């Protein structure tokens, strides 16, 4: 059995959703061959996917242009999306030719709009898995009759079934939807790299877009905290504050593996990080993303369901993190109970491929 999988290259959250489902499918049916259509770094993909796969790495969507991890560029996003949809028919034709050679039984997508017209053309099921889609995102920015909106609506309307985990946006363009439990990356047991440090510990995470700018040396004022920070391209001539420790992630040490060893995760709100905090029961200090249409829905979860506290982008940039960190660490709200949505999703997908 062959399955083609389209994964958005907008950050790591779409891969974080799809990977547990694909791993589950491989465990149930090790005979499945996967073709992944995804432009994310191969190292990141192989750190999350525990099986061999074919890959074609050209982009499968535009997503949203980020000025940095917590600030979106609406004008640049619309300009890029407008150019992309003008070539969409030609791109669909290329995808059809590619997949005819692969001969898939079905297509999965999170949440490239190319996948569903291709599935229809090949006469096979097209299944979506997502907590957001680009039609819903751009509908906040553009009129309903804009060519971007109508083109995306036409593509997504060809989806046979959309699977939606918790924390999903309202996505009315998909006619048939089914809710599933939480999809998450399971933490591996790793040695605690900061076990002997008695300070409170914060893991600073901003996903695939890297760290947004902030006043690094202001962190030394929070002397009771140790900050674990990845993606630090530090000038060797510049001294780091004594309470900042760089972290290098690899296949044997992922962000979720460190979460059980810290007191708080400081992050932008996004599905991947929030689901990992949920399952490791790690409190969340979050930075606002007011320009991104998904943010209000995620904020409802942060305000009402999680031990979490937010801060403005200005406070983050100036290094004024203390209030949010301390409030999140002692927040009385427990994380909700959860079930493994990858099991449910895999069973549904296999029922379409049989």
What are these regions (language model features)?
Residues 9, 32-86:
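Conserved nucleotide-sugar phosphate-binding/catalytic loop shared by glycosyltransferases and other
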Residues 15-26:
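Short amphipathic alpha-helix
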Residues 22, 185-264:
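Donor-nucleotide binding loops and adjacent catalytic segments primarily
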Residues 94-153:
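Conserved nucleotide-sugar donor-interacting segment of glycosyltransferase catalytic cores
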Residues 106-110, 254-297:
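A donor-sugar binding/catalytic signature common to diverse glycosyltransferases
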Residues 138-211, 231-233, 253:
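A nucleotide-sugar donor-handling region in carbohydrate enzymes
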Residues 248-249, 283-327:
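Nucleotide-sugar donor-binding patch of glycosyltransferase catalytic domains
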Residues 322-354:
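C-terminal amphipathic helix plus adjacent low-complexity
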């Amino acid at each position: 059995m062959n399955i083609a999988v389209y994964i958005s290259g907008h950050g790591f959250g779409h891969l974080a959703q799809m990977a547990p489902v694909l791993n589950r499918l491989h465990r149930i049916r090790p005979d499945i061959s996967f073709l992944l259509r995804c432009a994310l770094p191969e190292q990141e993909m192989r750190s999350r996917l525990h099986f061999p796969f074919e890959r074609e790495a050209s982009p499968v969507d535009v997503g949203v242009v980020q000025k940095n991890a917590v600030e979106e560029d609406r004008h640049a996003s619309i300009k890029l999306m407008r150019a992309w949809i003008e070539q969409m028919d030609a791109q669909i034709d290329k995808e059809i030719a590619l997949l005819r050679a692969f001969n898939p039984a079905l297509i999965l997508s999170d949440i490239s709009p190319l996948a569903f017209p291709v599935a229809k053309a090949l006469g096979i099921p097209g299944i979506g898995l997502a907590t957001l889609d680009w039609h819903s995102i751009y509908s906040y920015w553009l009129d309903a009759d804009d060519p971007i909106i109508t083109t995306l609506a036409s593509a997504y309307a060809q989806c046979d079934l959309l699977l939606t985990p918790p924390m999903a946006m309202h996505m009315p363009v998909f006619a048939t939807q089914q809710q599933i439990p939480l999809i998450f990356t399971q933490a591996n047991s790793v040695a605690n790299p900061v076990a002997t440090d008695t300070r409170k510990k914060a893991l600073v995470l901003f996903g695939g877009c890297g760290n947004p700018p902030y006043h690094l040396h202001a962190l030394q004022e929070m002397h009771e905290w140790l900050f674990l920070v990845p993606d630090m391209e530090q000038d060797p001539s510049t001294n780091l504050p004594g309470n900042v420790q760089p972290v290098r992630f690899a296949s044997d040490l992922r962000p979720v593996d460190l979460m059980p060893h810290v007191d708080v995760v400081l992050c932008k709100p996004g599905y991947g990080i929030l689901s990992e905090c949920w399952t490791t029961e790690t409190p969340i200090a979050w930075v606002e993303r007011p320009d991104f249409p998904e943010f209000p829905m995620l904020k409802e979860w942060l305000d009402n369901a999680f031990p979490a506290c937010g801060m403005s982008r200005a406070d983050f940039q100036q290094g004024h993190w203390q209030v949010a960190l301390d409030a999140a660490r002692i927040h009385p709200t427990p994380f909700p109970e959860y079930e493994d949505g990858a099991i449910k999703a895999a069973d549904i997908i296999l029922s379409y491929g049989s």
